């Protein structure tokens, strides 16, 4: 009996070390950033079983077998659609401003199409204005309405949008709604999904959370896009979820969420439509390629102004493109660079690009919320402040609520707005969308919004920052070490 017990013990020990060695080898063989690999190895060696389970669950990008197969199957038809779109030469810009040209060339080379011209844009900063405009557009819709959101929280004006969407479906408009399973958990536990389906709306719960499949698909891979397309002509995107901020996270202690949305009219809606069709096919297996833009789709003067490139990320989309776009924007800056984000845990490359811009004389400002709804990200963000301040970057801490806007403005001409936070999750993991806009007029509008944010912010004093307590510095460095995993 003793011999059997000893043998079992040795086999258990051997299996334990083989498991650690196998996971270690898997981490080392994956092409990933060194800080990320080191952080995972530290967790595994300090807390082996917890670390191994965590790595197998969220350490690698698993879309899931079925969705991965759909992603591979959709690309031949999507590539053909994009190639056919090139025949619509009237919608593509032939040149860009000097500051935007490198980024637009990058997007064209990697996505296969040039920037789309002939669009009319409107920046919207008040949730009531966004929802009222959306309700009007829904009421005037003639053919189709397609939406995707990370969060849909019932209550307030969000319910009015839901009612108008159901009314549209009842009068024959083809309505599709895709919502992230984790972000919209309150919605899917409410009566609204059944009400909408009964009205004729196709409602899809994207990336369902299922703990039984935790090792088969990465559970923290989320559908983070916020997009609306109406009649393949009107489109919305930005940082705002389908929530009324007066009813959303009121007990979080961070104030109301402050967002920015762009409402667009023009052929850019078609470019956004192909992104939506890819998401829909990955999730449902159904192909819904949008029609090409009509030759008469551009009523705006000379079909000029507001040239836009859509940049999408996520499994199945061009890898690392949003990260490359942000790097290109930072290195293209000559006069000033203003970045707004609720979560600031950048990659080493992006962090150095920001510091380098400031060190070569560019006026660099970063606007962050003073209070954050994520304690981990909040502490990790502060670990970057000392080097940013030393490089000459201005850090503004917004005090008027949780600033949720994601925006970048370069030299007043190149603007980036969308759903992408400056953190690892947005840069490398989630389904995201960003608009790159080459237009001085839009840049002026965005600058006015950012100036308003700055007027409601406090500039971080470098001298006071260096005098913060030792325990805060220790906490910052601790969370910074794990920042590659956040």
UniProtKB/Swiss-Prot annotation:
GO BP of this protein: cardiolipin biosynthetic process
Transmembrane feature ranges: 3-23, 38-58
GO cellular component, one term: plasma membrane
PROSITE patterns from the UniProt entry: PLD
Active site: 224, 226, 231, 404, 406, 411
Residue ranges occupied by any PLD phosphodiesterase domain in the UniProt entry: 219-246, 399-426
Recorded catalytic activity of this chain's protein: 2 a 1,2-diacyl-sn-glycero-3-phospho-(1'-sn-glycerol) = a cardiolipin + glycerol
Superkingdom of this protein's organism: Bacteria
Pfam family, one: PLDc_2
Alphabetical keyword list: Cell inner membrane, Cell membrane, Lipid biosynthesis, Lipid metabolism, Membrane, Phospholipid biosynthesis, Phospholipid metabolism, Repeat, Transferase, Transmembrane, Transmembrane helix
Main location as per UniProt: membrane
InterPro entries: Cardiolipin_synthase, CL_synthase_A, CLS_N, PLD-like_dom, PLipase_D/transphosphatidylase
Protein localization: Cell inner membrane
Topology with respect to the bilayer: Multi-pass membrane protein
EC id: 2.7.8.-
CDD domains: PLDc_EcCLS_like_1 (cd09152), PLDc_EcCLS_like_2 (cd09158)
GO molecular function, one term: cardiolipin synthase activity
Family in the record: Belongs to the phospholipase D family. Cardiolipin synthase subfamily. ClsA sub-subfamily.
Function: Catalyzes the reversible phosphatidyl group transfer from one phosphatidylglycerol molecule to another to form cardiolipin (CL) (diphosphatidylglycerol) and glycerol.
Protein name in UniProt: Cardiolipin synthase A
Species classification: Bacteria, Pseudomonadati, Pseudomonadota, Gammaproteobacteria, Enterobacterales
Gene assigned in the entry: clsA
